[in-house]
Amino acid sequence: MNTRSEPASECIRRRRIGNRVVAYRVVGTGPVALLLLHGWPQTGKAWRKIVPLLKSHATMVIPDLPGFGASSRPQSGYDKMTVAATMHDLMSALGHDSYHAVGHDVGGQILFPLAKLSPNAVTSVAFIEAGIPGLGNSLASGNPFTGGSWHFGFNMVPDLPEALLTGREALYLRWIFHRDSIGLVLGDAIDEYAFDEYVQALAAPGGIRGAMEHYRALPTDIEDNRRLAAEGPSPTTALVVGARQGVGLGWLDSVEESFDHVTSAWIEDCGHYIPEERPAELAELLLRHWRFHESRTVEP
């Protein structure tokens, strides 16, 4: 029997940050300020199963990234440096001077520039099936000749995805979520309610372009990340979580060379979409990560 997922919040709010409008939800009453950055091709709804598990521990800010969901779809500014600045400005506007940040997939790619741009604000980061483009072994994910996925190159091609996917958004997303290599192990983890939202977001005017621009920004991201890495590692505490049937810890080395303090963890019987497949296991890892961070910052 299909059951509808609980929305991440009853209220979607909108705030203008620079030249863009960011849609977001604020959920929870816990003492920890937490920024949750969803992956591709989803929206903030990807965190809906995490919310009830963390709401007593954290005050969660859950945006739709630029180009996704109810956020605006600007013509430019999809490089992760620009998106990181937008996300930090959102947290500042909401009164959060310091916060933890968690990112899945493309949301995780925002964490390194976020930590480098705002070192006094970002207290810890957690990469969920994600890493830092241009560093370590990260580029292998987009190379189909070494086991990577062809969709990286397809999504980066100007205009072609818009021409081919219009009217076929559901077909494409169904393939993305259920592909053999790193797709869902628990096939019903993304239920009809969530899937429909992701399809509608992609099918909205400018939705395909907005989603693809995150991939088209990768050459700029690679250049920016290498420049940031040359400045030295971030002192921010970092966690890397990989799924056994997903990308795994293939990008771990990119994080290890970029942060001073890195821990890692596996989640078993899980594909790429950890927040929707294994929310309880992920929530426990995040709580443990925050406790570890607090133990490091306690004065002797």
What would you call each of these model-derived segments?
Residues C270-A283:
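Catalytic histidine-centered segment of alpha/beta-hydrolase-like enzymes
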Residues R14, N19, G28-T29, P300:
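Intrinsic disorder/low-complexity segments, especially N-terminal tails and targeting/processing regions
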Residues T43-G44, Q109, G271:
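A short, glycine- and basic residue-enriched loop/turn
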Residues K45-R48, P52, A85, F112, ...:
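Surface-exposed alpha-helical interface segments used for non-catalytic interactions
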Residues V26-A70, V255:
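Conserved HGGG/HGGXW glycine-rich cap/lid loop of the alpha/beta-hydrolase fold
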Residues E294-P300:
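A short, highly charged, low-complexity intrinsically disordered segment
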Residues N2-R14, R20-V22, A33, V61, ...:
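Flexible "cap/lid" subdomain of the alpha/beta-hydrolase fold that forms the substrate-access gate
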